[in-house]
Amino acid sequence: PLPPPPPAPPPPPPPHPPPRPSPPGGPPGAAPPAADAPGAYADASEFLADLRLVESSLARHRGEHAGGFAVRRLLRRVQAFGFHLAALDLRQESSQHDAALAALLDDPDFPARPWTDRAQRLRDLVAGTDPVPKPDATDAARVLDVFRTVAQSLPRYGARAIGAYIISMSRSAADALAVLALARLGGCLDANGAVPLDVAPLFETVDDLDAAAATLRSLFADPVYREHLRERGDRQVVMLGYSDSAKDGGLVASRWALQQTQVALTALAAEAGVRIAFFHGRGGSLSRGGGKTGRAVVAAPRGSVDGYLRLTEQGEVIHRKYGIRALALRNLEQATGAVLRATLRPRKPEPREAAWREMAAAIAAAARAHYRGLVYETDGFVDYFRAATPIDVIERLRIGSRPSKRGNAGGVSALRAIPWVFAWSQNRCGLTAWLGVGTGLVQGIERFGHAAVAEMARDWPFFATLVDDVEMVLAKSDLGIFERYSRLAGDGHARFFPGIAAEFERTRGAILALKGTQHLLEGDFRLRQSIRLRNPYVDPLSLLQVDLLARWRAAGRPEDALFHALVTTVNGIAAGVQNTG
């Protein structure tokens, strides 16, 4: 037989392909976005439709074990995450919008004009009847770029990729109209020419919460904004600020203002045919709205939950509540159960609630007067605060998403709520959660009688939750250790410490009297025992921090080994005390 022929030589390698064109803003040679590829899904709903087709086909042809479970799992993931993974909320302070509009309109006095005048100008901008004198104003570029980015992102990642547009420090209807005007100027419009964003005013201070109903009434009556709401399904998102309202008026005044605002806005929305969705801007500490989510939901006004709950979870509590699968499921289960109970609760008010509201209003007013009298109206208190707390250390820590202060002012008003609360928890005083509470309760008992206030604290979920929260902070506070911090203030110690200590004891005595107990947390053995076990480890850190603060300040506050040791004590105390920021 003839030998086999020799093997054919290998084919020459193909020529090196030319580099792929880069997408706008992408690195050289990067692949084009999948959304731009031929045959790509336009949005997640198309992908879901195909997955459901596969699922039904497997079910019809006995293919359960040929991938049915995997398909259902992928279906759930697409339903939860779409093509975007997580929705991104947008947030900007109203003053930034006003500054941008002043530049675009070439009107430096625009922010100072009455809100009614600003609102009319903004309506004209939304309608396109008012030309913009300086559409390329550089001072407005940063604000407009946000809307341009949204306009580019929505077609690519889907409508669920962008959440609410939150306007912090909202004070009038003009603040919401400003978002619509800027969105149009930035080209952020859908196929119907509407702004594809939920505009969410954020009411933060006690005064702004009190005025929230008037603001929304003006918005619901505004034809331009009402048309926007119709495009958004007649659903209005409102964010409620727990942090700044408590810093502004104390815990009782803040909680009462939030309660009243929800009652008023729920009724107003029902009257206007709008479904209202409250977004609770809660923090990790009691002074910033923290606490047990389930109890807070059940204590919400009747009709305000309506099957919906949205709230912020702070970074320092996410791991504690959701870091372990079993804990995450338990927390979500408790929140879901609370929403169901609150939603199914009869809308008919409790017969005693009118009297309770009168008492709560009086207690809140007295508590706020005492709180503001010390914090905002007493000369020298800011200096005492800066000496008796480690605020000068906290201001240097790079742990927040925003600067510790608004602007360059040095008073309490300019300080953000997070460092304000954090500083008072570090020195073991917890003042932000109970200052004024004792005065308010004592005056309420004197005016309405002990039995009436005790009944309210027992039977009204709103007030019972408030009293329990304050009791927990009192149990975590240690006036003996706080006194050592207070002495760092020199002459300020003799001036301020006695009054603070007296209010602490007044609050403690009033709560024990209302509950008919001898000791704090008598009804919560697990929490009381947890505090007793943690404190022996936290106390040495607190004493060490006092010593380090004195030495570091005497040395001129350098960023040296003393400072780094102070940072370590801050972290340790925060971990031990919990509910700190």
Task: Locate predicted features.
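Extended, highly charged clamp/arch subdomains and adjacent linkers
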Residues: 1-7, 18-91, 98, 103-112
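Active-site-proximal structural scaffolding
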Residues: 47, 51, 67-71, 94, ...
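Conserved, mostly hydrophobic/aromatic
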Residues: 82, 201, 284
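Acidic, glycine-enriched catalytic cores built around paired aspartates
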Residues: 84, 89-91, 96-98, 110-135, ...
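Active-site cores of enzymes that catalyze phosphoryl transfer or operate on phosphate-rich substrates
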Residues: 86-88, 93-177, 181, 185-190, ...
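Secondary-structure transition/capping motifs at alpha-helix termini
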Residues: 155-160, 183-195, 219-234, 263-277, ...
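Catalytic cores of alpha/beta
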Residues: 211-215, 288-296
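Metal-dependent DNA phosphodiester-chemistry modules and their immediately adjacent helices/loops
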Residues: 222-230, 234-247, 290-293, 302-330
